[in-house]
Amino acid sequence: MITSELFGTAPCGTPVHRYTLNGPEICVRIMDYGATVLGIDVPDIPGNVRDVVLGFDKLEDYFDNPACFGATIGPVANRTAGATITIAGTDWHMPANEGTNNLHSDLEHGLHKRVWDVELDETHNAVRMTTSLEDGELGLPGNRTFTAVFTVTRTGVFRIEYGCESDRATYVSMTNHTYFNLAGHNAGMDCEHFFVANAAHYLPINEQNIPTGEIAPVEGTPFDFRELRPVAPGMEADDPQIKQARGYDHCLCIDGYQYGRNLRRAMHVEEMWTGRELDYYTTAPGVQLYTGNWLGDEHAKDDANYGWGAGFALEAEMYPDTPHQPLFPQGIVGPGHPYSNVIEYHFMRH
């Protein structure tokens, strides 16, 4: 069942609505401003239900949301060196919003700052959102139509399907930037998360947090999550990569990528005190693991104050800076070649 309610008004004057999708042992709240995930309620072992998604109570707080809580990021997620992408021999320039580089396309006018059009699909318990960009808008070519379909299935799986069609060759890498704390969004560091990643390689970064181009083995590094291990010790490891990012802010290269055709489990997360678990699936080649290294004391929902490490984000996407790295899986989108990225969240308790 889907419910809808007025949540407020965007700066442009457009009404913003909040949508609630219910399923077995899960309740998901989203909004059409930024195609944003607002909250996910799931039970622990004894049946205590908590919201495990970081965010705000009020719509107005999302207007200034540098952490991008819950947001749909695009058209290009993560970092792009020099804020420039070359497509078909032409250089296209995005805003240089992190030094000389670009982060998340445009932090002021990106997809997470728009009110998306909405169509409800009661039959499939889904909310379909669409928005568009004109040729050259946000610094990239093509008249582009973006879609985000949020579904809660009959088995309680939360599914996001991102898509884009363009009338010209362009580059797209969308993701969702939801932060999780499986002990409860306001648990802070009073939690114990253990991770497994289906990733034998990761992408080292340079002093500007841009991938160096190397696809490095995880063995012998803090990025080796091939077997269940706690994430907290790695966040403070005596490792130059960890120190550079103040924790994890690196792309894990998920095994078994087949150019977006296969949905596979990328990550498994367990919170030991509550027994909540998350299986994270995607069709994307990589998952940016970000451990909230730059979270400040945002005044958040339920009067929580988030700080360093208060939550983690799993960002399924193309590898960061792919247009400049010929060894990375490429993803040019154009006529007859649409973009797709499917993400699934399977919550459990054991």
Question: PLM features: what roles do these ranges have?
Answer:
Residues 1-350:
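An exposed, glycine/acidic-rich loop-and-rim segment of catalytic or binding clefts
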